[in-house]
Amino acid sequence: VSRIEDKKTTGYVFNIQKYSVHDGPGIRTIAFLKGCHLRCRWCSNPESQEPLPQVAVNNNRCIGTDKCHFCMDACPRGAVYSDGSKVAIRRELCKDCTDLACANACPAQGLNIYGKLQTVDEVMKVVEQDAPFYARSGGGMTLSGGEPFLQGKFALALLREARARFIRTAVETCGMCEQSVLLEAGKYLNYVLFDIKSMDSAKHKEMTGLPNEHIISNLKALCEEYPDKPILVRTPIVPGFNDTPEAVTAIAEFIEPFGEHVQYEMLPYHRLGTQKYEFLDRSYLMGDVSLDNLAYKKLLKYAHRVLKGRHHIPK
């Protein structure tokens, strides 16, 4: 594939975040790609799950359908309507809409778009703006999502182009992707952040929508294909799912044979994405569940002990 072709390759991106220090070494720019096979009950980025753009409705900003109806007039499908004095959307009518004229017509930003079709070159121009910070800190570009490898062609083109521009690369993956894409990406990745949520496949299916066998197989294949590549296995600790010493021990035993290049990190459950569910007219399935901070700290200490120096403490 030529660089000219790579630069023109397109994909759906829902955010580009600068100055991140939690998603790989150094200071990084994260490109968030849309689409994910999993439906984690605690997901903090619900806008990442569907592969196509979506409309977010923030009725706190809507000035009222008695004063304004630009969005309703702009929608070619009649999906936008007045629910009393505010805007509402018939989601089933706009599920595959990529025009989203309603959001572009809203003068108050009460409607916003999650997801934009961009070329590799457009993304890399943003990423490249902070190249001096990458050079000083050992940072670079991280692909995230969603599951970035769901848009395999686009993700691979981004990684190749970053390499061509001497920008270090990393990826955050849930592992639920085509193994061939993951292994091809390994050629262009300096660092991998790989989620292992649970070794219990039945619990995994209950909490994410899918079993874990394919994810486990993908991590094994990646470690075998690239035995020296730095990989950080991460587990979001979710109350009632994997917040036990037994769950951590099972993951520790799984990664132990892979060698010192595979490290481990626990991440605390949080509720920061709940408002986005409201914007998408979805229910947050974890309800009002919260993490017991004292129990989490004890679990951190336990992980540090059983992983014998391979356990990262989150920054």
At which residue positions do the language-model features occur?
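N-terminal pre-triad scaffold of radical SAM enzymes
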Residues: 13-67, 88-96
